[in-house]
Amino acid sequence: MDNILKASLPKLREKLLEALQAVLPIVAIVLVLCFTIAPISPSILLCFLLGAAMIIVGIMFFTLGAEMSMSPMGERMGTMLTKTRSLPLIIGVGFLLGFLITISEPDLQVLANQVPSIPNMTLILSVAAGVGLFLVLAFLRMLFGIPLPRLLVLFYSIIFMLAAFVPKEFLAVAFDSGGVTTGPMTVPFIMALGVGVAAIRSDRHAADDSFGLVALCSVGPILAVLILGIAFQASDSTYIPPVLPEVNDSVELWQLFREGLPTYFKEIATSLLPIILMFGVFQLVALKLDKRTIGRIAVGLAYTYMGLVLFLTGANVGFMPAGNYLGQVLAGQSFRWVLIPIGMLIGYFIVKAEPAVYVLNKQVEEVTDGAISAQAMGMALSAGVSLSVGLAMVRVLTGVSILWFLIPGYTFAIAISLIVPKLFTAIAFDAGGVASGPMTATFLLPLAQGACVAVGGNIVTDAFGVVAMVAMTPLITVQLMGLIAELKTRKARKAQPAFALAAAYAELPDDAIIEL
């Protein structure tokens, strides 16, 4: 165990640098705003800065922990499950995995508290069942080679038809649910399951099908919440703003965070327990991994646990109040339009601080053998999220229905999926679920809510939907990246024979060329 801990220290330093690069730009933007056009109280600023420090350390531990534990656990379980060749077992265990992982997702608890007229447990169980069913569907798609675009066309058509019957106060929250439930606990494990299942297949489309699980699992919650919205006819919507902190000294500042820590210690322990138990059953029955591998996974789980506790405490206690108050101040100015470019700038950098984004970018680079680098993937995600936050701020200021953005956006995304390589489509729809994580829920959503309060808008119809917008735009930007890469490849292939012929002639002696 000591050797494993020592071996992980250089990696921790590497992850710390990555975390600093991700979070410091957001801190810099907020500080510039605070000292220029958007003054905030010292209490909120101090909470934000301490929260940022906790988020940096949290990302450092989580990203290394996910590499050491969540990814290998998911891959081995996915591979072992597929090796059984038992369809009933794959369906049963697949549903159970999806159900348990979703119930344990911390962000789902936040969503449940925000949805009016539906009991929390009813919503949580319904969403978990939706993810479980669609995880099974994702497994079956991979095993039988069903094209992902066909399923996406079918289910998003059903979603938009159901949207016509859902009260407008409920619509944005329903679409937000798809992004929120694929959070930092769900994504690394589900993506690793996909890689494990695809590893058994030896055909040329196996790599293409190793992605797409998160895409389909994001559909389940949207359908579940839309159906619940119709059944419960939810129309009584109330908004409870976050409590703005007031501290007089450093002891009171630490007291705020210390009070939040036990909540997240408990939440993350509850989140990890079902996954650990399922892996324990697999280990006893089939995997039989050696002690060193189990030790590495155990250390990784400890890092994951510490990382998520620190990250969520920093995000909820430090970032959420700052985002809300900043939104109110910016939208309260006579030049409130500035909220749009500032939102785009924050959106560009904030996706880099999403814990699960690191897992996605790394797996994309590995599965594509470097054809899609982690850096290129990060740029595509940042561009997409920047655009989506800008559009979300337009909605806040104008009150335009979210459907005016979602229907054209998804129509275009699904249309280009018919001409883009399958791998890029699967990665793009996975990226949508990954990009809309806890940073979106704890900073961008409060930013929109605060701005909505300042302009006198409807919180439920105008501010909610930020998560849905963030989940939509990467579908377009990542696929466009894939389309450009494909066009470049085709151009290179066409040019290759001419270059090869010229090279062949160049190698011949002059008299040989004359004889030809």
Regions found by a protein language model. Name each.
Residues 1-19, 23, 74-88, 202-213, ...:
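Intrinsically disordered, low-complexity non-transmembrane regions of multi-pass membrane transporters
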Residues 24-37, 51-61, 93-100, 130-141, ...:
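Hydrophobic core segments of alpha-helical transmembrane domains in multi-pass membrane transport
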Residues 32-46, 66-74, 100-115, 134-146, ...:
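Transmembrane helix-loop junctions in multi-pass membrane proteins
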Residues 243-356:
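Transmembrane helical segments that form the transport core of multi-pass membrane transport proteins
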Residues 13-19, 40-50, 82, 115-124, ...:
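Interfacial loop-to-helix junctions that mark the boundaries of transmembrane helices
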